[in-house]
């Protein structure tokens, strides 16, 4: 905790550089700003499982959420979006459990508590929207649908949910939880937005709940963003099938076919889940294309639906490394009401003079614009 306190103390001495065009010698610490003062943002946090599975890595996840909280006003952050796999194992009782004793040193309860502690940085400041990953259910990875998530993420813990959480779906036991939930936002330029976060591999009942919701009189004119754990592979293809024992379920292509493609107002899909360790050249420069994917397809009525995958859990080059170098994405919703500017940033690298020059990922796969259709 001393190290985390030191990190957070460093963050208070911020100076600003543009999120859209960092140039010249970086200031220390590096703080992004919106390219337009009328914009707002949402922060996309990729799978945190490799932060929380090791005791030594857990402060890095809390660094991410503390940074988001500290920049809430600077970046006009409306929500933090978590792509799932909040933990590595949902129900592991023994830290050194077989079959993989090297895959973390924390029990599941310790992992979920670390998640809760990190999210507490955002309580009362903004809603955090969490979709459920395959590691968040079952024993280790989606053997069945039991999840500890409802014990740690529930409406009463964060007062910011009161103004945004508008609907929940029954889980596999018929109990309403935040495993599948919808959140509403309003903006003068963007109008009405609805963000729907799904359980992992959503069941038919969950897809039908979402369909009825987005077609209802209350939300049929909202632009809908789907936050789901598994959707795109690293090559940008939609995943057609996965090897988990879970049943009943819908894999990503079925989710597209049954819900997204026929819809008139789903305008964006965000996901994590996939991604492989980047390759490093002789100078230590990483090729991060394996941690990101983007594609655009037309819905049945002809409007474009961008789909974006971002997962940096192995962004340091190792599945069992530091958890991902604290990479996150800043989604800047521009005041034209249709453009989202995406940039990729590490609060960890930003706070040290030795690494500040690495705080941004500026390749085409990590800095781009998305155009979002109106219903």
Segments from the language model and where they lie:
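Extended active-site neighborhood of metal-dependent phosphoesterases/phosphodiesterases
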Residues: 92-208, 219, 262, 283-311, ...
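Active-site-proximal segments of metal-dependent phosphoesterases and phosphodiesterases across multiple
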Residues: 98-100, 104, 108, 205-208, ...
């Amino acid at each position: 905790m001393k190290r985390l306190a030191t990190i957070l103390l460093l963050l208070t001495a911020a100076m600003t550089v543009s999120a859209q065009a960092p140039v010249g010698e970086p200031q220390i610490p590096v703080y992004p700003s919106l390219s337009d003062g009328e914009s707002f943002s949402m922060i996309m946090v990729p799978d945190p499982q490799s932060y929380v599975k090791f005791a030594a890595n857990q402060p890095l996840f809390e660094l991410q959420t503390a940074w988001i909280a500290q920049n809430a006003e600077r970046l006009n952050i409306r929500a933090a979006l978590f792509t799932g796999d909040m933990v590595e194992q949902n129900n592991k009782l023994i830290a050194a459990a077989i079959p993989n004793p090297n895959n973390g040193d924390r029990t599941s309860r310790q992992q979920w508590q670390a998640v809760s502690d990190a999210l507490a940085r955002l309580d009362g400041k903004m809603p955090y929207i969490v979709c459920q990953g395959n590691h968040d259910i079952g024993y280790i990875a989606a053997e069945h649908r039991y999840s500890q998530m409802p014990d740690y993420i529930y409406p009463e813990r964060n007062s910011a949910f009161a103004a945004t959480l508008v609907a929940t779906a029954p889980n596999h036991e018929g109990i309403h939880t935040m495993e599948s939930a919808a959140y509403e936002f309003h903006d003068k330029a963007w109008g009405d937005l609805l963000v729907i976060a799904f359980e992992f591999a959503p069941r038919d009942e969950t897809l039908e709940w979402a369909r009825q919701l987005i077609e209802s009189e209350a939300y049929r004119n909202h632009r809908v963003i789907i936050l789901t754990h598994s959707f795109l592979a690293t090559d940008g293809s939609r995943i057609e099938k996965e090897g988990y024992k879970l049943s009943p379920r819908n894999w990503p292509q079925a989710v597209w076919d049954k819900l997204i493609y026929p819809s008139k107002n789903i305008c964006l899909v965000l996901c994590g889940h996939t991604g492989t360790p980047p390759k490093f050249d002789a100078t230590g420069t990483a090729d991060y294309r394996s941690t990101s994917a983007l594609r655009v397809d037309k819905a049945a009525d002809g409007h474009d639906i961008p789909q974006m995958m971002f997962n940096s859990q192995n962004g340091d080059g190792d599945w069992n490394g530091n958890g991902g170098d604290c990479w996150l994405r800043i989604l800047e919703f521009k005041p034209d009401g249709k453009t989202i500017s995406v940039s990729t940033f590490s609060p960890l690298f930003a706070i040290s003079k030795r690494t500040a020059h690495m705080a941004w990922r500026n390749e085409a796969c990590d800095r781009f614009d998305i155009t979002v259709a109106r219903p």
